[in-house]
A protein has these predicted regions:
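A short, Lys/Arg-rich alpha-helix, primarily the initiator
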Residues: 2-27, 184, 202
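The alpha-helix within a helix-turn-helix
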Residues: 25, 36, 65
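Short alpha-helical DNA-recognition segment
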Residues: 29-47
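DNA major-groove recognition helix of helix-turn-helix/homeodomain DNA-binding modules
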Residues: 57-77
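Non-catalytic, mostly N-terminal accessory regions of nucleic-acid modification and defense proteins
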Residues: 80-290, 294, 356-367, 474-477, ...
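Conserved S-adenosyl-L-methionine
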Residues: 272-383, 388-390, 394-399, 405, ...
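A conserved structural/catalytic subdomain of Rossmann-like adenosyl-cofactor enzymes
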Residues: 372-610
Length: 610
């Protein structure tokens, strides 16, 4: 899917750039030839720009940007049409990241790549942005010396202050730095580690975010990653076409980079790597369905790299327009795995989003609590917990200090904590809160139709009887990297609209996919179709059905699986049995006649037919 999306974005950017060049010529009165001379390019190049046939490289694109800036008032609006084209496109990003990953692939397993690539990518981004901010201060104070003097006195003038020895030119060896008191690093790994720790020291919000990896670490006397491998990584990121400054990449560049690498790690490492990755299309679908409002608090108890939270914020910005968003979302997440926790923190910093990511086991030790020690409650919860988690002691549910389980249908079985996560999510919602939870398909039906007692069905019954389930969406097979199973999105709403009370919206989206390698993916049109259908709540044949909670209880034994109610295939027409028997008799009669004719033929030939 990423390749398809990048192509669309690339084409859209070409058209926007084309309009900008045409408008520039119109306002200046320049001919194509004259503009080409002004910019130092050929007449053919300008002509191709205007036809949307050619996108300039980053160097030329920056030159166009600077030319428009020099024109002054009356031309500033053209910069908005140019900015997207100056930025690295998704395909360029993917190429850069995978080349970097491959450059050290022989030294580290795929799941370990991120421990080294992402912090380096982050420091490159910080350094390039810092350079841009220095340039801004130079314009304001007249020269670089004055600008740096002012900055040394007030670090708050920039987003993040980067000490000289931690800047990318010094790390990459392109600029010399004179270390004092014999503090010259002995290895490149030590140099990088020191730089990351120094940046974190100067910028407290980055503590525990970028300074958690030791690039100089050893195991059994050998370096975990050699200086040669680190140098190869640095050289890949030092390509001038891969600059990561303020206007070089889109705001969510690092978020996209994290997702891309996580996806590639999952592809390379097999199912074991899939646990930290939710397919980005599923995340976008959830964001579109939740449609968060300005100022709302959103929580992910299993936040991973923070992708679901970030997508909610980006969906808000895309829907309302960045300039109209006066109250950003407040994002909260908890994550157990150290590396994913650090990436989630990076994601928040990079996106300049208001939020808090804490580390710990949410099920046994939920960190977000109110002043009285109870669970903090949120407007929206989005999450993709581990499916069928079977390592929770059953006694834990009974002794839970937050009483998340006994009052919400009972205790989940030892074999699967799916509904325990749903119970935690419900306990974390405000009185009018909503939630989207990605679960194993079996969570919708296990225990239904059986005469014996089933703990999951009992909990499911509680949620249905209390009219808390607003919808269930069945996803296509083979989307997730840790399983080929389809998965569902369970939608909880504590405050359903009057027309939806007592009903559940079921969507069978199992056919809404494109084949991919190695996994299937949801198309952009599928995302729009599914989200629009759910939000409208109008029945669609073979796709969306509205079922009453009463019918689900009385006729379906609390089975809420969309596939039980919606068949996507063509209906098979069955013929009347008597007609079938009549046809069989006719065939047998014809067969008997044919046999008699054959007997006569063989007798004339001297053969006896027995």
């Amino acid at each position: 899917m990423i390749y398809n999306v990048s192509y669309v974005i690339f084409k859209e950017n070409l058209m926007e750039f084309s309009k900008t060049i045409k408008e520039l010529r119109k306002r200046t009165g320049l001919t194509q030839q004259k503009l080409a001379e002004e910019l130092g390019v050929s007449l053919l190049t300008v002509a191709r720009w205007e036809k949307g046939q050619f996108k300039p490289n980053p160097t030329i694109s920056r030159m166009v940007w600077e030319y428009i800036e020099k024109l002054g008032k009356g031309y500033e609006d053209l910069l908005s049409g140019l900015s997207n084209n100056e930025q690295m496109n998704i395909k360029d990003m993917e190429t850069m990241l995978w080349q970097a990953a491959c450059s050290i692939r022989g030294e580290k397993d795929a799941p370990k790549f991120k421990d080294y690539i992402l912090p380096l990518l982050f420091i490159k981004r910080l350094s390039d942005v810092f350079e841009d901010e220095i340039a801004r201060l130079v314009k304001e104070y007249g020269d670089e010396k004055s600008a740096r003097k002012v900055l040394e006195a007030d670090h708050s003038l920039v987003r993040f202050y980067i000490p000289e020895e931690a800047t990318w030119p010094v790390l990459s060896g392109r600029k010399e730095f004179k270390y004092t008191d014999n503090k010259t690093p002995k290895t490149l790994g030590e140099k990088i580690t020191n730089a990351l720790r120094l940046i974190a020291k100067e910028n407290p919000s980055l503590n525990g975010v970028i300074d958690t990896v030791d690039f100089n670490a050893t195991h059994n006397g050998e370096r975990e990653i050699s200086d040669d491998a680190l140098n190869r990584l640095i050289e890949k990121f030092s390509n001038p076409d891969y600059r990561l400054g303020i206007n070089d990449v889109e705001p969510d560049f690092l978020g996209r980079a994290y997702e891309y690498l996580l996806r590639k790690f999952a592809e390379s490492s097999g199912q074991s790597a899939g646990e930290f990755f939710t397919p980005q299309e599923v995340g976008w679908l959830i964001a579109k369905i939740m449609s968060p409002k300005q100022g709302e608090e959103i929580y992910d108890p299993c936040s991973g790299s923070g992708g679901l939270l970030v997508k909610c914020q980006l969906e808000l910005l895309a829907r309302d327009g960045k300039e109209k968003v006066k109250k950003p979302l407040k994002l909260y997440g908890q994550e157990l795995t150290g590396s994913s926790f650090a990436i989630a923190r990076m994601n928040m910093v990079v996106h300049d989003m208001e939020g808090e990511i804490l580390r710990g086991n949410t099920m046994t030790n939920p960190k977000f609590q109110d002043q009285s020690g109870g669970l903090k409650q949120f407007d929206i919860v989005v999450t993709n917990p581990m499916w069928n988690q079977d390592n929770i002691d059953p006694d834990f549910y009974e002794n839970d200090p937050h009483e998340r389980f006994s009052s919400r249908g009972g205790y989940a079985p030892a074999s699967s904590a799916d509904w325990a996560w749903v119970q935690h999510v419900h306990a974390s919602l405000k009185p009018k809160g909503r939630a989207a939870i990605v679960l194993d398909t079996g969570a919708a039906s296990r225990g239904s139709g059986s005469q014996s007692e089933n703990k999951e069905k009992t909990i499911r019954k509680w949620f249905v009887d209390n009219d808390l389930i607003e919808g269930v969406i069945l996803l296509p097979d083979n989307l997730f990297y840790n399983t080929t199973a389809a998965g569902i999105i369970l939608l909880i709403n504590k405050n359903k609209s009057p027309e939806r009370k007592g009903k559940i919206i079921l969507i069978n989206a199992s056919d809404e996919f494109e084949k991919g390698r190695p996994k299937n993916y949801l198309t952009e049109s599928a995302l729009k179709k599914i989200s629009a259908a759910f939000n409208s709540g109008v029945e669609i044949k073979k796709f969306l059905k509205i079922v009453s909670c009463k019918e689900i209880a009385e006729k379906h034994d609390y089975n809420i699986s969309p596939s039980r109610f919606i068949e996507t295939g063509e209906a098979v027409e069955h013929r009347d049995i008597q007609l079938i028997l009549d046809d069989i008799a006719k065939i047998e009669k014809e067969q008997s006649k044919n046999e008699q004719d054959l007997k006569k033929i063989f007798l004339r030939l001297g053969y006896k037919w027995n």
